[in-house]
């Protein structure tokens, strides 16, 4: 208690008479077990429970002969005894101190001891005061743990003893303390300057640092060169730290601070330390759905994309390959210094099954595998090393197409194929099933050239023409215009399914695998051949005389 408060209190005692509720002065005459006997100049001595004389540390604060202030509860309680209370006296003293502090705009000391709606409760010399949440500090504070249980200074901003209502402010004390210091600091603060500060508060995005009357924001991205999830990984409330002033807005009194800028930037000359293709050990620091981050050195992290984790499984979740804290070998794939990004690969440090396959097998080799899946565009075959090869729809059968071609296959079937091509860079292996056998179309075309006369059976017929089965799954096309020299409006009026026809091959398109037939052309050729044969027979049937006569007559005419 200050000297003025003590004088005020003593003066108040002089003006009191010995009525119940009065604060009087007594002498401790005995301390016996659970009771303290006090002589206050009344008819009888009063006894007070000894626990009213213990401090917060559990220590007895009086001894025999000490002068104490006590409250008079009753001059005689019916048994001829005087009832006194040290607690009520202490409470009265506290109210006098609060009233004096309120009137003089001076500070009082108290302890934050609880949370209530809208703020906190503060014990000020035994009086329960209310501290609004907005008046805890000069800026909003989410976490007050570091303030609770400590003796702090407050100003009384509202006081009503009758209603037992006391409101205090810590913010007013801080603003008063910081005013002069703040002005001096604002005058001297410069960008690039290194200063000391105390961490006041932590948020998800950074920490507020008290520089001495001025708060600065240390953003989470300026705490360390490495990736961190929360500021508490680097600093704690109450820490005294050195920081660098990155930006100072004098008009708005806003200060941006940096901690990592006090050390050397690890990204300087990063490409010289980690050339593309370098293999190093790295520590996994974080997992995401799209990959994992790995630390090459303090402050330098790279991303291993999920596609660079495994040669054969492109959609594997990173947690199936690595865990946070794992030490893994990685290869540097690319460094973007400007964007501070490093692309890393794990699979590049392992044997490439595509290159292994390419070195082991050649185009034309036969290889067996198990059908893993059947899609609209082909069949995927599982091969050794965990890789797949594709039999494209067009390489399943020489004659069947679409669903017809894949109908006889199912998942899990063991299948023999021919290697058509291997592209390790694009990670593609093309396989073929139909290439296990000779191409029946090519064989047929080599035996039946253009102009050949062939026999077949009508397989299908519509108005425009017919499909002719030539045997060995070879088909020919007979258009309506090629059925007869006479005009055919509807091929169905001339041909029937199952009917045998004889026709001439008028074209073979090896690329589209189409053989065009013509009965009309065959009939024309047959007629020409018949005419030649007829003329030949007529010449042979005429005798030598007849021939000589003809020659002679011709010579005569010429003459």
From Swiss-Prot:
Pfam families: S1. GO terms for cellular component: cytosolic small ribosomal subunit. InterPro entries: NA-bd_OB-fold, Ribos_protein_bS1-like, Ribosomal_bS1, Ribosomal_protein_S1-like, S1_domain. It comes from the Bacteria. The keyword Phosphoprotein does not apply. Signal peptide: none annotated. Residues 21-87, 105-171, 192-260, 277-347, 364-434, 451-520 form the S1 motif domain. GO terms for biological process: translation. Keywords: Repeat, Ribonucleoprotein, Ribosomal protein, RNA-binding. One of its GO terms (molecular function) is mRNA binding. SUPFAM superfamilies: Nucleic acid-binding proteins. Gene3D superfamilies: Nucleic acid-binding proteins. PANTHER family: 30S RIBOSOMAL PROTEIN S1 (PTHR10724), SMALL RIBOSOMAL SUBUNIT PROTEIN BS1C (PTHR10724:SF7). Binds mRNA; thus facilitating recognition of the initiation point. It is needed to translate mRNA with a short Shine-Dalgarno (SD) purine-rich sequence. Belongs to the bacterial ribosomal protein bS1 family. This is Small ribosomal subunit protein bS1. It comes from Pseudomonas aeruginosa (strain ATCC 15692 / DSM 22644 / CIP 104116 / JCM 14847 / LMG 12228 / 1C / PRS 101 / PAO1). The lineage of its organism: Bacteria, Pseudomonadati, Pseudomonadota, Gammaproteobacteria, Pseudomonadales.
